[in-house]
Amino acid sequence: MARFIFITGGVVSSLGKGLMAASLAALLQARGYKVRIRKFDPYLNVDPGTMSPYQHGEVYVTDDGAETDLDLGHYERFTGVPGRQSDNITSGRIYQTIIQKERRGDYLGATVQVIPHVTDAIKEFARADTEGLDFVLCEIGGTVGDIESLPFMEAIRQLRNDLGRGNSIFVHLTLVPYIAAAGELKTKPTQHSVRDLTSLGIQPDVLVCRCDRPLPEGERAKIALFCNVPTEAVIPALDASSIYGVPLQYHEEGLDEAVLSAFGIEAKDEPDLTRWTEIMDRLENPEGEVTIGVVGKYVGLLDAYKSLHEALVHGGIANRVKVNIRWIDAELFEQEEGGIAAQLEPMHAILVPGGFGERGSEGKIAAVRFARERKVPYFGICLGMQMACIEGARNTAGIAAASTTEFGPTDEPVVGMITEWMSEDGLQKREAGGDLGGTMRLGAYDARLSGNSHAATIYGATDISERHRHRYEVNVHYRESLERGGLVFSGMSPDGELPEVVERPDHPWFVGVQFHPELKSKPFDPHPLFASFIAAALQQSRLV
């Protein structure tokens, strides 16, 4: 039977519960245990798929097509365990399920209440699909005291009894702030947070204390005394120069040993942290430096591109170079005459990421043109590939009116909804439930690369599988025109209907992909496209 680790947070939000959960899972993995991490999100949205990137950050997509919290990206990057639909639940989905059951009469006329119906649904989710695991780590979103999280707190309190003593523990992450006027760290917020937690019937077994400077032994002992935990179970969590140094830091402070001790497990052998020390060696001792210009729409909140940021870092790790990322608002290129060159000339490579909507699209197209004409390495992801196709259609294929139906009616739909295509016979509609699936293409799909293509060389294979999240596709009926203009369709869906990869053979490095390769990149296994892209940027840096 799997043991459960429930992770809660207190004092303030954004302390790093997700990173702590991912790091702890990585440490347990390094000791030979099989782990899985889950996220409980108390918000009432069914999933984050329709939430604003400015509020929620990126939507992380799993192989099975789940639209999930960005923390699942951390979990997968740190452990290498692919996330699943069963690893993320929201209050919205819980209530949706319960209401559907009530409407069907599944409750046989009973009064449906938070206890037991909501809490039972949460417990059922937590315990599902855990066969063969040693540890299941469950992160509770939000902060202790939030109204939204109360049903989840009650559910995990009940789970401790359901699982039996010794089969679950509680880890609580808090803030120990430094008050400059007093010249000391203050433990009172942590004490109050634990008091709030115990008032809900939950006594933490391990306390992880975020602080910006070392936690003195006296303060550590004070926290242990007032919060009713052993001193060795009070774990300082200092700021780190890189998130990939966090597992090493937590191990040094004894987090994994404290967790095993709370379960009554003796930590016999040291964990194998070789790959984490190697990653940090490459990050701290780079042999070069590149600057990547990311021309996007949501640059006001970098969490909107979290996986992309990390994948670029992974590309740097693969090449042992430091990657500097310049986030550039695509709308700037629509407002400032001649501003493109000033912004992009210092860049060693240009990337246009995914996104939705018309705002900033002409700026992205201008960035594609700059990269194509100046022979600067270009990487287009999802919308970035579509913009590359529209730019190519307009400027190298002679289709001046080329556009996408996403932005409105157009006479030249080079990009269109998955359910509609332009052929020689006119606009063709495909049913949402047909062979091509629904209007949102989600999750992992296979693709086939041309054997002599740049993409196949990068992958070292011709059959690949990548994750998608999009409603629009490049219209395959424009393939011949675009290829005459030098933009080659080097990757297609297995049935040959959906373009997956485009490239320019006459360019040093120009690749567009309809999928999201950043979702599968890991620090110890960088995605080949990002490794190759950063290598091309490094080559470009030596030319300027």
Swiss-Prot record:
Keywords: ATP-binding, Glutamine amidotransferase, Ligase, Magnesium, Metal-binding, Nucleotide-binding, Pyrimidine biosynthesis. PROSITE patterns: GATASE_TYPE_1. GO terms for biological process: 'de novo' CTP biosynthetic process; pyrimidine nucleobase biosynthetic process. The keyword Nuclease does not apply. Its EC number is 6.3.4.2. GO terms for molecular function: ATP binding; CTP synthase activity; glutaminase activity; identical protein binding; metal ion binding. CTP binds at S13, D146, I147, E148, K186, T187, K188, P189, T190, Q191, K222. Homotetramer. CTPSs have evolved a hybrid strategy for distinguishing between UTP and CTP. The overlapping regions of the product feedback inhibitory and substrate sites recognize a common feature in both compounds, the triphosphate moiety. To differentiate isosteric substrate and product pyrimidine rings, an additional pocket far from the expected kinase/ligase catalytic site, specifically recognizes the cytosine and ribose portions of the product inhibitor. This is CTP synthase. It comes from Rhizorhabdus wittichii (strain DSM 6014 / CCUG 31198 / JCM 15750 / NBRC 105917 / EY 4224 / RW1). The lineage of its organism: Bacteria, Pseudomonadati, Pseudomonadota, Alphaproteobacteria, Sphingomonadales.
